[in-house]
From Swiss-Prot:
It comes from the Bacteria. InterPro entries: Aldolase_TIM, RibuloseP-bd_barrel, Trp_synthase_alpha_AS, Trp_synthase_suA. The alpha subunit is responsible for the aldol cleavage of indoleglycerol phosphate to indole and glyceraldehyde 3-phosphate. Pathway: Amino-acid biosynthesis; L-tryptophan biosynthesis; L-tryptophan from chorismate: step 5/5. CDD domains: Tryptophan_synthase_alpha. The keyword DNA damage does not apply. Transmembrane segments: none annotated. One of its GO terms (molecular function) is tryptophan synthase activity. It comes from Caldicellulosiruptor saccharolyticus (strain ATCC 43494 / DSM 8903 / Tp8T 6331). This is Tryptophan synthase alpha chain. Tetramer of two alpha and two beta chains. It holds the Pfam family Trp_syntA.
Length: 253
């Protein structure tokens, strides 16, 4: 069983929701990144590790800034895989990266490396559902979950995608990029309600979730909460503030 499936089953039995925490690999520096990753990993249920890219179209200002800084650290994909192998324990890890990085390594080799080094899932935000077949086939071959991103723009399209989704369905809480500072779009509640009619795959929500209040609103309808930009901001403020934030979110999930 994929570790993501196992984790969501465990949480369901306990009546808990998944804390899915994101950070950018290589941030804030090449030397410090593993310490921060281990710290975040100790609080979350699922770790989402972003691999930096020069044109991250789905990412907002905060994660773009983290990616730019990480790229200056001369971060390589091999560094990411070796680090996962080094620190991973009993909780799942998802890699978030852009398609060009996968193509550069080769689709077959990339997903075999995911299996061999311990990545449980992959999120590729610039590949549409219609373009994902080759990636999903490689995932199945290696026991890795391909996580579908679903937006609030079309409920019927979202339902079509969710019917075949694996691991968890990543539901975007609003139109736009990560870290958006506005209010959560209320149509996310309708979307989640409709998706539950067509899939038993866990539903996770993300993009712009930044506070305990946001989490409390969404945890009643979602199976998991994804937080990224807010974690990056707390890294900038220092480990004490980061730990306080992680503890706060952990306490309400």
């Amino acid at each position: 069983m994929n570790l993501i499936d196992k984790k969501f089953e465990e949480l369901k039995i306990k009546g808990k929701k998944a804390f899915i925490g994101y950070t950018t690999f290589g941030y804030p520096t090449k030397g410090e990144t593993l310490d921060y990753i281990k710290l975040i990993y100790s609080y979350v249920d699922v770790l989402e590790l972003g691999f930096p890219f020069s044109d991250p179209i789905a990412d907002g200002e905060v994660i773009q800034r983290a990616s730019v800084k990480a790229l200056k650290e001369d971060i390589k994909l091999d560094h990411l895989f070796y680090s996962i192998e080094k620190f991973k324990k009993d909780k799942p890890i998802a890699i978030m990266l852009y398609a060009n990085t996968v193509y550069k390594r080769g689709i077959e080799k990339f997903f075999k490396d995911c299996k061999d080094f311990g990545a449980d899932a992959v999120i590729i935000p610039d590949i549409s559902y219609e373009e994902s077949a080759e990636f999903k086939a490689a995932c199945r071959e290696n026991g890795v979950h391909y996580i579908d991103l679903i937006s609030i723009s079309s409920i019927e399209r979202a339902k079509m995608i969710a019917k075949t989704s694996k691991g968890f369905v990543y539901c975007v809480t609003r139109k736009g990029v990560t870290g958006f500072k506005g209010e959560i779009d209320k149509s996310i509640y309708e979307l989640l309600s409709e998706l539950k009619k067509v899939t038993s795959t866990p539903l996770a929500v993300g993009f712009g979730i930044k506070s305990k209040e946001d989490v409390l609103k969404l945890k009643e309808v979602a199976d998991g909460i994804v937080i990224g930009s807010a974690i990056i901001n707390k890294i900038d403020e220092g480990k004490e503030d980061l730990v306080s934030f992680l503890e706060t979110i952990r306490s309400v999930l």
